[in-house]
Swiss-Prot record:
A GO cellular component annotation in the UniProt record: plasma membrane
Alphabetical UniProt keywords: Cell membrane, Disulfide bond, G-protein coupled receptor, Glycoprotein, Membrane, Receptor, Stress response, Transducer, Transmembrane, Transmembrane helix
Species: Homo sapiens (Human)
Gene: GPR132
Protein name: Probable G-protein coupled receptor 132
Annotated family: Belongs to the G-protein coupled receptor 1 family.
Length: 380
Protein backbone atom coordinates (compact mmCIF):
# COMPACT_ATOMS: atom_id res chain seq x y z
CA UNK A 1 0.00 0.00 0.00
CA UNK A 2 1.52 3.31 -1.04
CA UNK A 3 1.59 6.13 1.52
CA UNK A 4 -0.40 9.26 0.79
CA UNK A 5 0.81 12.78 1.67
CA UNK A 6 -2.03 14.66 3.31
CA UNK A 7 -1.88 18.33 4.22
CA UNK A 8 -2.26 18.83 7.92
CA UNK A 9 -5.11 21.32 8.25
CA UNK A 10 -3.66 22.92 11.37
CA UNK A 11 0.02 23.47 10.60
CA UNK A 12 0.18 23.05 6.82
CA UNK A 13 2.72 20.22 7.03
CA UNK A 14 2.45 17.10 4.92
CA UNK A 15 1.86 13.93 6.89
CA UNK A 16 2.38 10.46 5.37
CA UNK A 17 -0.55 8.17 5.99
CA UNK A 18 -1.91 5.01 4.43
CA UNK A 19 -5.19 5.51 2.64
CA UNK A 20 -7.92 3.08 1.79
CA UNK A 21 -11.49 3.14 0.63
CA UNK A 22 -14.40 0.80 1.20
CA UNK A 23 -14.14 -0.41 -2.40
CA UNK A 24 -10.42 -1.13 -2.08
CA UNK A 25 -11.44 -4.67 -1.34
CA UNK A 26 -12.68 -5.10 -4.89
CA UNK A 27 -9.13 -5.89 -5.94
CA UNK A 28 -8.50 -2.36 -7.15
CA UNK A 29 -5.22 -0.52 -7.18
CA UNK A 30 -4.31 1.17 -3.92
CA UNK A 31 -2.12 3.87 -5.49
CA UNK A 32 -3.07 7.32 -4.34
CA UNK A 33 -2.47 10.92 -5.31
CA UNK A 34 -0.71 13.57 -3.23
CA UNK A 35 -1.69 16.88 -1.69
CA UNK A 36 -5.37 16.18 -1.03
CA UNK A 37 -6.54 18.58 1.68
CA UNK A 38 -9.10 17.37 4.21
CA UNK A 39 -9.33 20.68 6.07
CA UNK A 40 -11.38 22.47 3.38
CA UNK A 41 -14.43 20.29 3.97
CA UNK A 42 -14.00 19.54 7.68
CA UNK A 43 -16.37 22.15 9.12
CA UNK A 44 -19.11 21.50 6.56
CA UNK A 45 -19.00 17.75 7.09
CA UNK A 46 -19.07 17.99 10.88
CA UNK A 47 -21.99 20.44 10.87
CA UNK A 48 -24.08 18.50 8.34
CA UNK A 49 -23.47 15.08 9.89
CA UNK A 50 -24.22 16.41 13.38
CA UNK A 51 -27.43 18.11 12.23
CA UNK A 52 -28.64 15.06 10.31
CA UNK A 53 -27.95 12.81 13.29
CA UNK A 54 -29.73 15.16 15.70
CA UNK A 55 -32.81 15.53 13.49
CA UNK A 56 -32.77 12.17 11.75
CA UNK A 57 -32.82 9.86 14.77
CA UNK A 58 -36.06 11.18 16.34
CA UNK A 59 -37.69 11.78 12.95
CA UNK A 60 -37.04 8.24 11.76
CA UNK A 61 -38.06 6.78 15.13
CA UNK A 62 -41.41 8.52 14.76
CA UNK A 63 -41.64 7.47 11.12
CA UNK A 64 -40.90 3.84 11.94
CA UNK A 65 -43.52 3.81 14.70
CA UNK A 66 -46.24 5.36 12.53
CA UNK A 67 -45.38 3.10 9.60
CA UNK A 68 -45.48 0.03 11.85
CA UNK A 69 -48.98 0.96 13.00
CA UNK A 70 -50.07 1.16 9.37
CA UNK A 71 -48.37 -2.13 8.50
CA UNK A 72 -50.29 -3.85 11.28
CA UNK A 73 -53.47 -2.47 9.73
CA UNK A 74 -52.56 -4.05 6.38
CA UNK A 75 -51.20 -0.99 4.58
CA UNK A 76 -48.93 -2.12 1.72
CA UNK A 77 -47.17 1.20 1.19
CA UNK A 78 -46.30 1.32 4.88
CA UNK A 79 -44.05 -1.74 4.46
CA UNK A 80 -41.69 0.28 2.26
CA UNK A 81 -41.97 3.28 4.57
CA UNK A 82 -41.06 1.14 7.57
CA UNK A 83 -38.06 -0.44 5.85
CA UNK A 84 -36.86 2.96 4.64
CA UNK A 85 -37.19 4.46 8.11
CA UNK A 86 -35.33 1.57 9.76
CA UNK A 87 -32.56 1.83 7.17
CA UNK A 88 -32.21 5.57 7.71
CA UNK A 89 -32.33 5.11 11.48
CA UNK A 90 -29.51 2.58 11.37
CA UNK A 91 -27.42 4.90 9.23
CA UNK A 92 -28.01 8.07 11.25
CA UNK A 93 -26.94 6.11 14.32
CA UNK A 94 -23.46 5.71 12.80
CA UNK A 95 -22.97 9.40 11.98
CA UNK A 96 -21.24 10.19 15.31
CA UNK A 97 -18.43 7.87 14.16
CA UNK A 98 -18.09 9.95 11.00
CA UNK A 99 -17.88 13.12 13.06
CA UNK A 100 -15.13 11.66 15.24
CA UNK A 101 -13.24 10.50 12.15
CA UNK A 102 -13.43 13.87 10.41
CA UNK A 103 -12.49 15.86 13.51
CA UNK A 104 -9.49 13.54 13.85
CA UNK A 105 -8.23 14.64 10.39
CA UNK A 106 -9.48 11.48 8.66
CA UNK A 107 -7.52 9.15 10.94
CA UNK A 108 -9.57 6.13 11.98
CA UNK A 109 -8.86 5.21 15.61
CA UNK A 110 -11.93 3.11 16.43
CA UNK A 111 -10.72 -0.19 15.05
CA UNK A 112 -10.84 -1.90 11.68
CA UNK A 113 -14.14 -3.68 12.33
CA UNK A 114 -15.90 -0.42 13.17
CA UNK A 115 -14.56 1.09 9.94
CA UNK A 116 -15.85 -1.83 7.90
CA UNK A 117 -19.28 -1.84 9.52
CA UNK A 118 -19.70 1.94 9.24
CA UNK A 119 -18.60 1.98 5.59
CA UNK A 120 -20.87 -0.97 4.80
CA UNK A 121 -23.89 0.69 6.42
CA UNK A 122 -23.19 3.98 4.67
CA UNK A 123 -22.90 2.72 1.10
CA UNK A 124 -25.72 0.22 1.56
CA UNK A 125 -27.94 2.98 2.92
CA UNK A 126 -27.50 5.14 -0.17
CA UNK A 127 -28.75 2.52 -2.60
CA UNK A 128 -31.25 0.86 -0.28
CA UNK A 129 -32.84 4.29 0.17
CA UNK A 130 -32.86 4.93 -3.56
CA UNK A 131 -34.48 1.57 -4.31
CA UNK A 132 -37.10 2.01 -1.61
CA UNK A 133 -37.94 5.45 -2.98
CA UNK A 134 -38.52 3.73 -6.31
CA UNK A 135 -40.73 1.12 -4.65
CA UNK A 136 -42.77 3.79 -2.90
CA UNK A 137 -43.24 5.75 -6.12
CA UNK A 138 -44.19 2.62 -8.06
CA UNK A 139 -46.66 1.50 -5.40
CA UNK A 140 -48.32 4.92 -5.37
CA UNK A 141 -48.36 4.90 -9.17
CA UNK A 142 -50.16 1.55 -9.29
CA UNK A 143 -52.59 2.49 -6.53
CA UNK A 144 -53.55 5.83 -8.12
CA UNK A 145 -53.31 5.31 -11.88
CA UNK A 146 -54.64 1.73 -11.82
CA UNK A 147 -56.87 2.04 -8.79
CA UNK A 148 -59.50 -0.48 -9.94
CA UNK A 149 -57.14 -2.97 -11.57
CA UNK A 150 -54.79 -3.07 -8.58
CA UNK A 151 -57.49 -3.57 -5.98
CA UNK A 152 -56.84 -6.89 -4.30
CA UNK A 153 -53.51 -7.40 -6.08
CA UNK A 154 -51.38 -5.14 -3.92
CA UNK A 155 -50.49 -7.38 -1.01
CA UNK A 156 -48.43 -6.86 2.08
CA UNK A 157 -46.64 -10.18 1.55
CA UNK A 158 -45.42 -9.06 -1.86
CA UNK A 159 -44.09 -5.80 -0.41
CA UNK A 160 -42.24 -7.72 2.31
CA UNK A 161 -40.70 -10.04 -0.28
CA UNK A 162 -39.57 -7.12 -2.46
CA UNK A 163 -38.07 -5.38 0.58
CA UNK A 164 -36.15 -8.50 1.55
CA UNK A 165 -34.79 -8.82 -1.99
CA UNK A 166 -33.58 -5.21 -1.90
CA UNK A 167 -31.73 -5.72 1.36
CA UNK A 168 -30.14 -8.95 0.15
CA UNK A 169 -29.14 -7.58 -3.27
CA UNK A 170 -27.58 -4.36 -1.96
CA UNK A 171 -25.94 -6.23 0.91
CA UNK A 172 -24.28 -8.71 -1.44
CA UNK A 173 -23.06 -5.98 -3.80
CA UNK A 174 -21.33 -4.11 -0.96
CA UNK A 175 -20.14 -7.13 1.01
CA UNK A 176 -16.52 -6.83 -0.29
CA UNK A 177 -16.17 -3.82 2.03
CA UNK A 178 -15.44 -6.33 4.80
CA UNK A 179 -12.29 -7.48 3.01
CA UNK A 180 -10.56 -4.12 3.55
CA UNK A 181 -7.22 -4.59 5.33
CA UNK A 182 -6.03 -1.02 5.98
CA UNK A 183 -6.37 0.33 9.49
CA UNK A 184 -5.57 4.05 9.67
CA UNK A 185 -8.06 5.73 7.35
CA UNK A 186 -11.58 5.02 6.22
CA UNK A 187 -13.98 6.17 3.46
CA UNK A 188 -11.30 7.98 1.46
CA UNK A 189 -10.63 7.67 -2.25
CA UNK A 190 -8.16 5.79 -4.40
CA UNK A 191 -6.58 6.70 -7.66
CA UNK A 192 -8.77 5.69 -10.58
CA UNK A 193 -8.16 2.63 -12.68
CA UNK A 194 -10.27 0.84 -15.29
CA UNK A 195 -12.18 -1.25 -12.76
CA UNK A 196 -13.03 1.71 -10.54
CA UNK A 197 -14.15 3.64 -13.64
CA UNK A 198 -16.46 0.77 -14.58
CA UNK A 199 -17.74 0.66 -11.01
CA UNK A 200 -18.53 4.39 -11.16
CA UNK A 201 -20.35 4.01 -14.47
CA UNK A 202 -22.45 1.20 -12.98
CA UNK A 203 -23.27 3.17 -9.85
CA UNK A 204 -24.36 6.18 -11.89
CA UNK A 205 -26.47 4.17 -14.33
CA UNK A 206 -28.03 1.49 -12.12
CA UNK A 207 -27.95 3.36 -8.82
CA UNK A 208 -29.05 6.80 -10.00
CA UNK A 209 -30.11 7.31 -13.63
CA UNK A 210 -32.56 4.39 -13.83
CA UNK A 211 -34.15 5.06 -10.40
CA UNK A 212 -34.46 8.76 -11.25
CA UNK A 213 -36.26 7.89 -14.48
CA UNK A 214 -38.64 5.61 -12.59
CA UNK A 215 -39.37 8.19 -9.91
CA UNK A 216 -39.87 11.01 -12.42
CA UNK A 217 -42.14 8.91 -14.66
CA UNK A 218 -44.33 7.49 -11.89
CA UNK A 219 -44.81 10.81 -10.12
CA UNK A 220 -45.59 12.54 -13.41
CA UNK A 221 -48.26 9.94 -14.18
CA UNK A 222 -49.66 10.25 -10.66
CA UNK A 223 -49.93 14.00 -11.06
CA UNK A 224 -51.57 13.71 -14.48
CA UNK A 225 -54.06 11.13 -13.23
CA UNK A 226 -55.02 13.24 -10.23
CA UNK A 227 -55.32 16.34 -12.42
CA UNK A 228 -57.87 14.60 -14.65
CA UNK A 229 -59.86 13.37 -11.67
CA UNK A 230 -63.22 15.07 -11.14
CA UNK A 231 -63.68 13.87 -7.57
CA UNK A 232 -60.87 15.86 -5.98
CA UNK A 233 -60.88 19.47 -4.89
CA UNK A 234 -58.35 22.03 -6.08
CA UNK A 235 -56.61 21.91 -2.71
CA UNK A 236 -56.26 18.13 -2.87
CA UNK A 237 -54.87 18.30 -6.39
CA UNK A 238 -52.36 20.96 -5.38
CA UNK A 239 -51.28 18.81 -2.46
CA UNK A 240 -50.60 15.83 -4.72
CA UNK A 241 -48.77 18.05 -7.22
CA UNK A 242 -46.51 19.54 -4.57
CA UNK A 243 -45.83 16.12 -3.08
CA UNK A 244 -44.82 14.69 -6.45
CA UNK A 245 -42.54 17.64 -7.18
CA UNK A 246 -40.98 17.42 -3.73
CA UNK A 247 -40.12 13.75 -4.22
CA UNK A 248 -38.20 14.42 -7.42
CA UNK A 249 -36.51 17.56 -6.07
CA UNK A 250 -35.32 15.86 -2.87
CA UNK A 251 -34.02 12.92 -4.88
CA UNK A 252 -32.10 15.25 -7.19
CA UNK A 253 -30.71 17.42 -4.40
CA UNK A 254 -29.57 14.49 -2.26
CA UNK A 255 -28.21 12.08 -4.85
CA UNK A 256 -27.57 13.90 -8.15
CA UNK A 257 -24.43 15.91 -7.17
CA UNK A 258 -22.47 12.94 -5.84
CA UNK A 259 -23.34 10.65 -8.75
CA UNK A 260 -22.50 13.38 -11.25
CA UNK A 261 -19.04 13.61 -9.68
CA UNK A 262 -18.68 9.84 -10.09
CA UNK A 263 -19.66 10.16 -13.75
CA UNK A 264 -17.18 13.01 -14.31
CA UNK A 265 -14.34 11.00 -12.79
CA UNK A 266 -15.16 7.91 -14.84
CA UNK A 267 -15.50 9.93 -18.05
CA UNK A 268 -12.22 11.75 -17.33
CA UNK A 269 -10.45 8.43 -16.86
CA UNK A 270 -11.77 7.25 -20.21
CA UNK A 271 -10.81 10.55 -21.85
CA UNK A 272 -7.28 10.68 -20.42
CA UNK A 273 -6.88 6.92 -20.90
CA UNK A 274 -5.72 6.43 -17.36
CA UNK A 275 -2.97 9.07 -17.37
CA UNK A 276 -1.81 9.17 -13.74
CA UNK A 277 -0.80 12.84 -13.59
CA UNK A 278 -4.01 14.06 -15.21
CA UNK A 279 -6.20 11.91 -12.97
CA UNK A 280 -4.32 12.95 -9.82
CA UNK A 281 -4.88 16.58 -10.71
CA UNK A 282 -8.58 15.89 -11.20
CA UNK A 283 -8.80 13.98 -7.90
CA UNK A 284 -7.18 16.85 -6.02
CA UNK A 285 -9.54 19.41 -7.57
CA UNK A 286 -12.69 17.36 -7.06
CA UNK A 287 -11.96 15.81 -3.67
CA UNK A 288 -13.63 18.51 -1.55
CA UNK A 289 -16.68 18.66 -3.81
CA UNK A 290 -16.90 14.88 -3.84
CA UNK A 291 -16.93 14.44 -0.06
CA UNK A 292 -19.32 17.38 0.43
CA UNK A 293 -21.74 15.95 -2.14
CA UNK A 294 -21.41 12.54 -0.51
CA UNK A 295 -22.28 14.22 2.77
CA UNK A 296 -25.26 15.89 1.11
CA UNK A 297 -26.74 12.47 0.37
CA UNK A 298 -27.22 11.99 4.11
CA UNK A 299 -29.82 14.78 4.15
CA UNK A 300 -32.11 12.20 2.60
CA UNK A 301 -32.36 10.67 6.08
CA UNK A 302 -34.20 13.77 7.29
CA UNK A 303 -36.16 14.48 4.11
CA UNK A 304 -37.74 11.03 3.69
CA UNK A 305 -39.84 11.14 6.88
CA UNK A 306 -41.10 14.61 6.00
CA UNK A 307 -42.16 13.69 2.47
CA UNK A 308 -43.48 10.17 2.75
CA UNK A 309 -44.98 10.02 6.23
CA UNK A 310 -45.71 13.41 7.71
CA UNK A 311 -47.26 14.56 4.41
CA UNK A 312 -49.86 11.77 4.32
CA UNK A 313 -53.30 12.09 5.86
CA UNK A 314 -53.12 8.99 8.07
CA UNK A 315 -49.72 9.95 9.41
CA UNK A 316 -50.81 13.50 10.12
CA UNK A 317 -53.76 12.12 12.08
CA UNK A 318 -51.48 9.85 14.08
CA UNK A 319 -49.04 12.69 14.75
CA UNK A 320 -51.95 14.92 15.77
CA UNK A 321 -53.25 12.23 18.12
CA UNK A 322 -49.80 11.75 19.66
CA UNK A 323 -49.34 15.51 19.99
CA UNK A 324 -52.77 15.84 21.62
CA UNK A 325 -51.96 13.05 24.08
CA UNK A 326 -48.59 14.60 24.83
CA UNK A 327 -50.21 18.01 25.34
CA UNK A 328 -52.80 16.57 27.74
CA UNK A 329 -50.09 14.73 29.66
CA UNK A 330 -47.99 17.89 29.76
CA UNK A 331 -50.93 19.93 31.05
CA UNK A 332 -51.62 17.37 33.77
CA UNK A 333 -47.96 17.43 34.72
CA UNK A 334 -47.99 21.24 34.86
CA UNK A 335 -51.13 21.25 37.04
CA UNK A 336 -49.60 18.69 39.38
CA UNK A 337 -46.38 20.66 39.58
CA UNK A 338 -48.29 23.92 40.17
CA UNK A 339 -50.40 22.34 42.92
CA UNK A 340 -47.33 20.93 44.59
CA UNK A 341 -45.59 24.31 44.36
CA UNK A 342 -48.62 26.09 45.81
CA UNK A 343 -48.84 23.62 48.69
CA UNK A 344 -45.17 24.13 49.40
CA UNK A 345 -45.58 27.91 49.46
CA UNK A 346 -48.53 27.62 51.84
CA UNK A 347 -46.55 25.39 54.17
CA UNK A 348 -43.82 28.00 54.26
CA UNK A 349 -46.17 30.91 55.13
CA UNK A 350 -46.32 32.15 58.79
CA UNK A 351 -50.02 31.34 59.19
CA UNK A 352 -49.52 27.84 57.81
CA UNK A 353 -46.53 27.31 60.06
CA UNK A 354 -48.58 28.44 63.05
CA UNK A 355 -51.36 26.03 62.10
CA UNK A 356 -48.93 23.15 61.80
CA UNK A 357 -47.43 23.66 65.24
CA UNK A 358 -49.41 22.33 68.24
CA UNK A 359 -50.42 24.94 70.79
CA UNK A 360 -52.75 24.35 73.69
CA UNK A 361 -55.81 26.45 73.20
CA UNK A 362 -57.60 27.97 76.16
CA UNK A 363 -60.57 25.98 77.39
CA UNK A 364 -63.72 28.01 77.85
CA UNK A 365 -66.46 26.78 80.12
CA UNK A 366 -69.76 26.07 78.43
CA UNK A 367 -71.74 29.22 77.99
CA UNK A 368 -68.81 31.54 78.66
CA UNK A 369 -68.24 34.41 76.20
CA UNK A 370 -65.47 34.20 73.69
CA UNK A 371 -62.32 36.25 74.24
CA UNK A 372 -62.49 39.69 72.74
CA UNK A 373 -59.21 39.26 70.88
CA UNK A 374 -58.92 36.18 68.75
CA UNK A 375 -58.07 35.22 65.19
CA UNK A 376 -60.88 35.64 62.75
CA UNK A 377 -60.54 32.04 61.67
CA UNK A 378 -60.89 30.72 65.22
CA UNK A 379 -64.37 29.82 66.47
CA UNK A 380 -65.68 29.73 70.00
Amino acid sequence: MCPMLLKNGYNGNATPVTTTAPWASLGLSAKTCNNVSFEESRIVLVVVYSAVCTLGVPANCLTAWLALLQVLQGNVLAVYLLCLALCELLYTGTLPLWVIYIRNQHRWTLGLLACKVTAYIFFCNIYVSILFLCCISCDRFVAVVYALESRGRRRRRTAILISACIFILVGIVHYPVFQTEDKETCFDMLQMDSRIAGYYYARFTVGFAIPLSIIAFTNHRIFRSIKQSMGLSAAQKAKVKHSAIAVVVIFLVCFAPYHLVLLVKAAAFSYYRGDRNAMCGLEERLYTASVVFLCLSTVNGVADPIIYVLATDHSRQEVSRIHKGWKEWSMKTDVTRLTHSRDTEELQSPVALADHYTFSRPVHPPGSPCPAKRLIEESC
